[in-house]
């Protein structure tokens, strides 16, 4: 069982498996500092290639820098991988996130990620969040300039609305959109539908609701048991069937959990099974998860 079973989607000119890996959880508590078990993290990252995972998503604010450094240490020179990173957020303290979309700050973020990841050009650089205190056109303009100069291969957006996507498209081709989305929290449904219409990959972060959907007491547990799979696999399988444009990026520091997540790529839900999981999600109380 490998991630290839989920199929692929084109991110610009790059084909990626639709079950990827989110590297936010490679850090310590509060997405700050080093992980508690560095050996487990390295084992997890080293297992990605053998499991067919080809897309890895990180950010300079994870750690900060810790996640990018660990990805580089385990995967460089990235043969067979598309490595995406993000910039535009800064970290005042654990669990805290602040935007900094000043053009000079965004340029510094890209230059820093190039150095930290050890590459001459970033496969995919995503604006982590549009800074409401800086004109969006100024943020988009410097990103477009960096792409033209060869620092960035493809540009993506994160935590955005449909109008923001359209504003960005005036400056550059939007290669991907990354928003919070899972079977319970579907506030980004209009964004997903817009991406489908445009043929833009939609990267679903927190696909397991920071672990709540994968827990033994998950609201999906009874339905998953009937299917002979784990609750987390049910959540991921629902996402992968929801749209061929969705890329799910569950994260973990545990090699066993990684294998469990990847096995979800081979789960083939019937239309009835998909509808049942959807009904459960709609009945559930909305899980209010943070949006870094």
Give the predicted meaning of each segment:
Residues 27-31, 90-97, 214, 257-260:
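A short acidic, helix-capping loop that chelates divalent metal ions and anchors anionic groups
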Residues 34-48, 101-117, 161-166, 187:
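Short, acidic/polar
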Residues 21, 58, 85, 124-127, ...:
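Conserved beta-strand positions
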Residues 1-82, 210, 286, 291-292:
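N-terminal binding-site loop/beta-alpha segment at the start of enzyme catalytic domains
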Residues 3, 130-292:
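Beta/alpha (TIM)-barrel catalytic core signal, keyed to glycine-rich beta->alpha loops juxtaposed to Asp/Glu
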Residues 53, 119-122, 152, 174:
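A structural motif
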């Amino acid at each position: 069982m490998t991630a290839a079973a989920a199929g692929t989607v084109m991110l610009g000119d790059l084909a990626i498996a639709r079950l990827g890996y989110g590297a936010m959880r490679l850090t310590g508590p509060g997405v700050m500092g080093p992980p508690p078990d560095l050996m487990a993290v390295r084992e997890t990252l080293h297992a990605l290639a053998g499991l067919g995972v080809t897309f890895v998503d990180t950010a300079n604010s994870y750690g900060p820098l810790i996640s990018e450094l660990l990805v580089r240490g385990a995967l460089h020179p990235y043969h067979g991988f598309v490595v995406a990173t993000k910039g535009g957020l800064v970290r005042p303290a654990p669990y805290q996130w602040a935007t900094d979309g000043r053009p000079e700050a965004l340029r510094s973020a890209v230059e820093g990620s190039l150095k930290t990841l050890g590459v001459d050009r970033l496969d995919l650089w995503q604006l982590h969040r549009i800074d409401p205190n800086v004109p969006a056109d100024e943020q988009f303009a410097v990103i477009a300039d960096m792409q033209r100069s060869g620092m960035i291969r493809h540009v993506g957006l994160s935590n955005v609305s449909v109008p923001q996507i359209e504003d960005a498209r005036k400056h550059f081709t939007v290669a991907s959109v990354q928003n919070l989305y899972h079977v319970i929290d579907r506030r980004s449904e209009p964004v997903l539908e817009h991406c489908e219409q445009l043929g833009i990959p939609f990267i679903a972060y927190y696909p397991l609701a920071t672990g709540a959907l994968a827990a033994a007491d998950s609201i999906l547990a009874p339905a998953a048991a009937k299917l002979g799979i784990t609750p987390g696999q049910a959540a991921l399988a629902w996402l992968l069937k929801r749209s061929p444009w969705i890329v799910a990026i569950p994260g973990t520091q545990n090699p066993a959990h990684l294998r469990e997540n990847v096995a979800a790529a081979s789960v083939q839900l019937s239309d009835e099974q998909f509808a049942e999981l959807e009904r459960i999600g709609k009945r559930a109380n909305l899980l209010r998860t943070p949006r870094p």
